[in-house]
Amino acid sequence: MRFKSVFTLLPLLAQLPSGGASLPNNHGRVENCVRNHDGIHKFRHSNNTYQSMFPGVTWDEDQWVLTTSSLDQGHYQSRGSVANGYIGISVSSVGPFFELDLPVAGDVINGWPLYSRRQSFATISGFFDIQAETNGSNFPWMNQYGGESVISGVPHWSGLILDLGDDDYLDSTVDNVTLSDFKSSYDFKAGVLSWSYTWTPAGDKGSYAITYRLFANKLNVNQAVVDMEITPSQDGHATIVNVLDGYSAVRTDFVESQEDDGAIYSAVRPWGIPDVSAYFYANITGSKHVDLSSRRLIHGKPYVSANESSIAQAADVNFVANEKVRITKFVGAASTDAFPDPQATAKRAVSEALDAGYQRSLRSHVQEWASIMHEDSVDRYVNPTTGKLPDDDNIINSAIIAVANTYYLLQNTVGKNAIRAAQDAPLNVNSFSVGGLVSDSYAGLVFWDADVWMQPGLVASHPEAAQAVTNYRTKLYPQAKKNIETTYTGSKNATYIDPSAAIYPWTSGRFGNCTGTGACWDYQYHLNGDIGLSLIYQWVVSGDTNTFREKHFPIYDSVAALYGSIVERNGSYWTLTNMTDPDEYANHIDAGGFTMPMISETLEYANQFRQQFGLEPNETWTEISENVLVLRENGVTLEYTTMNGTAAVKQADIVLVTYPLVYDNYTAETALTDLDYYANRQSADGPAMTWAIFSIAAGAVSPSGCSAYTYHQYSYAPYARAPFFQLSEQMLDNASINGGTHPAYPFLTGHGGANQVVLFGYLGLRLLPDDAIHIEPNLPPQIPYVKYRTFYWRGWPISAQSNYTHTVLQRSQSAPLDTADRRFANTSIPVFVGLADNATLHHLPPHGPLTVRNREIGTINTIEDNLIQCSPVSSTDAFEQGQFPISVVDGATSTRWQPSSSNASAVTVNLGSTTGRSVQTVASGFHFDWAAAPPVNASVIFHDTPLSDPVAALSSPGPHVRIVANLTNIEQSGPYDPEATDLNEIKIPVGNTTRIELAQEVPVGRYATLVISGNQALAQADGEDHVGATVAEWAILGPKSGSPRRRIQPVPLL
C-alpha cells in the first residue's frame, strides 16, 4: 500500500529561501585550496571525513579530497590522472613519474584495437596520427581505403627525480620498504594530486621527507606545474633531475630536443602527419640550496628512457639537515592543431608560468576550477540541517562518485575562460575519447560513448564545457557527408542515398572517415541518431536556437536523410538489414530493437524541426517513422529478428529505448517487461555504463520497490578502483576470467553513465525539444535527501532538491547562459511531471519555488504485507561483484545477493526507527525468491541488538536472539528440467520461491538476519568452498490482519 505521508508542505515552504539557491562562496573555497597546497601551510582535513569503500582511503566531504595511505605500485588502476582539457597525463602511485606496469596473471596488455603495453600515458588534445592498420579491427579489409587515425602520445612531462648517487634515486620503481608515512591525496576542488612520505634509502644517506604536488593549469591550459619539497635528516649532496621521458611518446616521430634559455624541450609529431608537431618545454626554479647554475643535460640514467625524444636536465642540491628544499617544475605545451607556432607557444607558456611562480599559478588554476565545478554543480547527499552525510556506506560512496564523475569528465574539457585566455584557439573541439587525455585505451578514439554516455549528464550541468562533443561532430560534418560516397564498401552499394545525407564512422580520430575500426556501413547505424540526440540536448540546455538552426540542424537533417535512404520495406513495415545494435554480441543482424525506434524518433523530430524552421516536412519520413519494424515475443522487444532465449547481452540495448530515447510508441508496460527481461540477460562481462540506464529506467517504469537504487550502486561500485574512484570498463580486470577483455582505464564512459543516474533517474529529468521542463521525481527511501546539481534549461539555471515525498524546483541565483532563451526571462516555465501519457502540468515562477509530489514507489510493496522492502541492509560477508546485499529487499527479482562463499553467509535488515517503522509489529511468515541458485539451508533470526557473528548465533542464540525459521534441504519450486525447458523461448525467468506461514505470529525485533548455506546450482557437493547461492528477494510478511503502514519521516527541504 502506498504510504500517504503526514508530512505537510507548509514547513517545507517556510524554510525555502525566497530568492533561490544561495551562491557558492568561491572566495573562501579558493583561499582554503591555496592554503592547503601552497607549501607554507599544512594541509588540514575537515571534520566531515568518512571511510570510503576502499581500505585506507578516506573522503573529505567538505573539501572533496580523497586520501589514501595504501601504496600499490606498478598497476594502472592506482595511477592518478591529471588533465585540463588540453594536456593530460597519468602518473605513478608514488609520485609524478612515468611507470611501466608489472604483470598481473602474466598480463600487461591494454585492450582493443592497439593491444599495447600498459604504461603511463600522456598526450595533447587532437594529437591523432594516421597509420595503415591497428592490431585489432572490426573490418580489416577497410584499411585499403585509408588506414586508421589513433591517438599519439607525447613525452611524459611531469618527472622530477631526486638522485642521491650510487643508484639511489626516487622514481616509480622505488622499493616500498624504504617508504614510510605514505599518503597520497586527490583534491577535486583544487584540481591537485599530491603525495607525501618519508624515503629512507638503504645505507647511511639518511632519510628524506618528500612532498609532491601536480596540476595541469585549468585556466592557462598550455601550462602545468610539479612542485617538490625535500626535508633531509642530514647534510649531503644530490641532484634534482627534470625529465621529459619519451617512452610515452608512442606512435610519434621525433622532431628535436635540446636546451633553450635554461629550459629543456622535446618535440614529436604523430605518425604520418608531417605538418603537425607538439612541443613540450620544462624549466625549474629552486630554493636557496638548489644550484640552478649547475643545470646540465644528463644521459644514460636508469630513470630516463633511451627513447630519442627523451631529455633530462640535472641540477645540484646541497642538503642541510632539517632544512626544507623546494623545487618547482613548470611545463609549457602546444601542438600545431591548436596553435600555428607550437614551439613559440610552448616556450612562451613555460616562461609565463615561471614568471608567475608557483603561488600565482596555483591560484589561477584553483580559481578556474572553482568557477567551473562549484558546489552547486555536483549532486549532494548531505543533510541540509546537519551538513553531514547519512551513516550509510552506499550513500557515502555515492557522494564520492558524484564528485569524481563530474571532475574526471570536466578535466577533459576546456572552459570559456581558458579559451579566452588562449586568444580563442580551437581548444574544446575534440570530444571525449574512452579514456580521456590520460589513456590510449581504445586507441584514444571517439565512439558513441561521448554522445550517449558522457555528454548527457555533463551537458545538463555544464553546457559550455560539454560543447566539446557537438563541436567535434560539427567539425567533422563535411567528412560525414563525403562518407556517403563510400557505399561501395558495404551492402548498400546499390541503394540510392539522398545526396543531403551524412554518415559518421563508428570510431573517429583526426579525419572522421570510414575505417577498419570505424565502419560506416553495415554496422552500428544508431551512432548517427545518437549524435542527433546530443545535438538536441545541447540545444535544450543552452537555449541557443541560432546555433542549432545554423550548425546542428543541418547535421540532424542529414542523419534523417541517411535513415530515410537505408531502410527498406518489409510488408507494411520498414526495416534495416545487415546492421548491429548496441549489443555487440550480435553483429550483422536485421531490425535492431534500439536502432529501429531511433530511426523513427529521428525522422519524426527532423520533420518537427523542419516545420519550426520554415522548411517543408518530408512525407516519406513520416510514413517510415510511423511504421518501423519492432518485433516482440511474449511482450519482450527483440533485439533482432532471429533472437532467441539463449542470447546473452553485452551492454545496454533495448533498455535505451526507455531512456535516453524516450520513444513515443512504447508503453510503460512494455518498457517494464523489457527492463525485467534484459536485466536477467545482461552479461556480467559487459562494460560499466550499462547499469546506469537500468537504474534510470527502473525509476521511471517500475511500479514498486527501489531497484533503481540497487542498479545505481551497480553502475559504479563494482567498477571503481582504489584509491581515486576511477572506473574500469570491467567488474573484473583479469582478462583470463572476464571474457577476454583487457579493460579500458580510466573508463570515462562508465563515469558518464553513472553521472546520469541522479539527475535523469531520481529527478526523472528529460531534455525534450519543446517549451517545458519534464521531470518525474522518484527518490529511493534509502536516500533521505538529495540536492541535485544545478541544471540548465533553455539557458536558465534550475536548482532542485528532493526528500522521499516531495521535490522543490526553483530558479538558481547563478547567472543564465549568454545564449539563454529570453522568452523565459520574466515568465513562468511550464513543468510537466510524470510520463507523457499521464503528465500533470505545473508552472515554475520566475521567483519562488515549485513543489511537486514524488512517485514514492519504494513504499509500494511488490510482495503484499512485506515489512522490510527498501529497508537498510548490511552484510559482513564477501559477495560477488555487483551482487549486493541490498538486492534482497529492493522489490525486484532481477537483482540478487550472492555471497562469494557457499559456506554460511548472512544478510541483516534493520527494521528500526531509521525507516520510520515501529519495531513492535509481528511477522506472520516469510517469502523467498532464490532465483536460479537456491541455497541448501536457510535460517531467519530476529534480534534486538546487532550480531557480530550471525552464523555463531544459530548455535548459541542468547537472550535477545530468536531463531524464527530453519529451512533444510530447500525444495526447488521450479527445478531446471532439460526435457521440458525450451531454452530458445523468450520469456521473463521465474525464480525458485519458498513461502513460509508461521503457526503463530512472532514479534519482530529491531533486526532480522537471513543466514544461507550451500548452493543447489552447483554440480555436486565436493567439500570445497564455492560461490554462494542467490537471493533475489526476501520478504517478512506482516500480521495477517494487515501489515502496519510504513512511515518515512522526510528530511526537511531547505
Swiss-Prot record:
Coiled-coil regions listed in the entry: none
Source organism per UniProt: Emericella nidulans (strain FGSC A4 / ATCC 38163 / CBS 112.46 / NRRL 194 / M139)
InterPro entries hit by this protein: 6-hairpin_glycosidase_sf, 6hp_glycosidase-like_sf, Gal_mutarotase_sf_dom, Glyco_hydro_65_M, Glyco_hydro_65_N, Glyco_hydro_65_N_sf
Domain of life: Eukaryota
Protein name in the entry: Acid trehalase
This enzyme's EC code(s): 3.2.1.28
Glycosylation positions in this chain: 47, 135, 176, 283, 307, 493, 513, 570, 578, 618, 644, 665, 734, 803, 826, 838, 903, 937, 966, 992
Signal peptide: 1-21
Entry keyword annotation includes RNA-binding: no
Keywords: Glycoprotein, Glycosidase, Hydrolase, Signal
Protein encoded by which gene: treA
Any one GO molecular function term: carbohydrate binding
Binding residue positions for substrate: 448-449, 650-651
Keyword Glycoprotein: yes
Biological process according to GO: trehalose catabolic process
Cellular component terms per the entry's GO annotation: extracellular region; fungal-type cell wall; spore wall
Annotated family: Belongs to the glycosyl hydrolase 65 family.
Active site: 584 (proton donor)
Reactions it catalyzes: alpha,alpha-trehalose + H2O = alpha-D-glucose + beta-D-glucose
